[in-house]
């Protein structure tokens, strides 16, 4: 299913990379939000009203709905940001039309930038990042949410909106933004980026809840599954390095590499139980988006633009398997008591 969805790029370009007439004006521009994930979720739920077969959960119809949503997610994300940037920040409004010949990465860069200009390297690196974020099994929070909500028999738009609500949380899709802001805070405390003692001191203060958000976390380090290394991060590392060299940001990339190398040592010294930790895919994602001049408000929406493909595949899988409704098992730790008639009257 997943390969079929990914392989439908030409179908997306030719037929579905467009929103209903006046949708941008009547929905996206009318009630702007300062949170792009909220904006996208609202738009997805509103698209239900434009679908004559919105509640039809047959496989063919759901596949059609999923392909349409995959195709318009870049538009919902970027247009939502432009609406916010104009109406709430009083900046110029840019609403470009998506070209059917462009890839998803090219559409994002073209719609986002006033002059629509981007380099082939920029598009290639962003495309790689989207692919790496596209799917990560059924155990992550938003994908599991898709399974749970789909098992109830609800429509595609409601299931995707629920997945968006999950990804919106800072413990899930918001991690790449946290990494970026953490490094911005590091730069305020450490003036010499080559001073490894100063870097280690800052990392220790992070773990001691003395700096940044005081949560005791080094964002971008560690993963529930990838405890030795995150293969997605290793691929992204090389791509971001090429882009940083091309854009003249060698020093900043070197800073990220130093923190990636030093953080496991600091965590090993500070934690009593230590099984190893490595940088995850979020570690370099924020730097990549920064090098592409993508605003922080769009970091998590770009995650969603990629992950909608995985959600779609898992929704179809759940429907094809015709499973029962998913509900958690519960264990009561209270003592059972015989019901006393009239006890609460």
What are these regions (language model features)?
Residues 1-7, 12, 335-338, 342-345:
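Single conserved hydrophobic/aromatic residue that forms the stacking wall/gate
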Residues 176-209, 304-333:
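Catalytic or ion-translocation cores adjacent to nucleophile or general acid/base/metal-coordination motifs
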Residues 84, 88-161, 166, 181-276:
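Accessory "access/gating" subregions that flank catalytic or transport cores
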Residues 20-84, 128:
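Active-site cavity-forming subdomains of large catalytic enzyme subunits
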Residues 8-9, 13-22:
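An N-terminal structural lobe/cap that precedes and organizes the functional/catalytic core
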Residues 249, 255, 269, 273, ...:
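Domain-length cofactor-binding catalytic modules of enzymes
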Residues 9, 13, 27-28, 39-44, ...:
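Short alpha-helical scaffolding segments that buttress acidic/His motifs in well-ordered protein cores
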Residues 153-181, 218-219, 223-229, 278-314:
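Conserved phosphate/anionic-ligand binding catalytic regions in large, soluble enzymes, centered on
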């Amino acid at each position: 299913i997943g390969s079929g969805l990914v392989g439908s790029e030409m179908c997306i370009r030719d037929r579905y990379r467009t929103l209903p007439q006046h949708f941008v004006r009547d929905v996206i521009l009318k009630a702007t939000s300062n949170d792009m994930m909220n904006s996208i979720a609202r738009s997805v739920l509103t698209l239900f009203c434009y679908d004559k077969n919105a509640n039809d959960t047959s496989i063919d119809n759901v596949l059609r709905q999923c392909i349409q949503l995959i195709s318009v997610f870049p538009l919902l994300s970027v247009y939502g940001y432009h609406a916010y940037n104009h109406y709430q920040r009083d900046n110029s409004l840019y609403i470009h039309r998506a070209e059917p010949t462009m890839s998803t990465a090219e559409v994002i860069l073209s719609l986002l930038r006033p002059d629509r200009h981007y380099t082939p390297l920029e598009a290639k690196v962003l495309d790689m990042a989207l692919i790496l974020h596209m799917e990560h099994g059924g155990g992550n929070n938003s994908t599991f949410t898709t399974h749970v909500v789909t098992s109830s028999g609800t429509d595609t738009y409601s299931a995707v909106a629920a997945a968006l609500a999950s990804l919106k949380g800072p413990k899930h899709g918001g991690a790449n933004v946290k990494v970026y802001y953490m490094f911005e805070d590091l730069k305020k405390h450490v003036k010499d980026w080559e001073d490894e003692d100063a870097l280690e001191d800052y990392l220790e203060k992070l773990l001691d809840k003395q700096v940044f958000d005081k949560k005791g976390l080094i964002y971008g380090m560690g993963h529930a599954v990838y405890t030795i290394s995150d293969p997605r991060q290793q691929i992204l590392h090389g791509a971001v390095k090429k882009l940083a060299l091309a854009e003249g940001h060698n020093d900043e990339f070197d800073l990220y590499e130093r923190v990636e190398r030093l953080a496991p040592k600091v965590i090993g010294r500070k934690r009593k139980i230590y099984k190893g930790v490595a940088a995850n895919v979020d570690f370099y994602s924020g730097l990549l988006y920064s090098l592409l001049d993508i605003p922080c408000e769009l970091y998590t929406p770009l995650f969603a633009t990629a992950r909608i493909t995985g959600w779609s595949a898992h929704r179809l899988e759940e429907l094809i398997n015709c499973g029962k409704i998913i509900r958690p098992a519960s264990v009561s730790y209270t003592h059972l008591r015989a019901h006393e008639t009239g006890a609460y009257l």
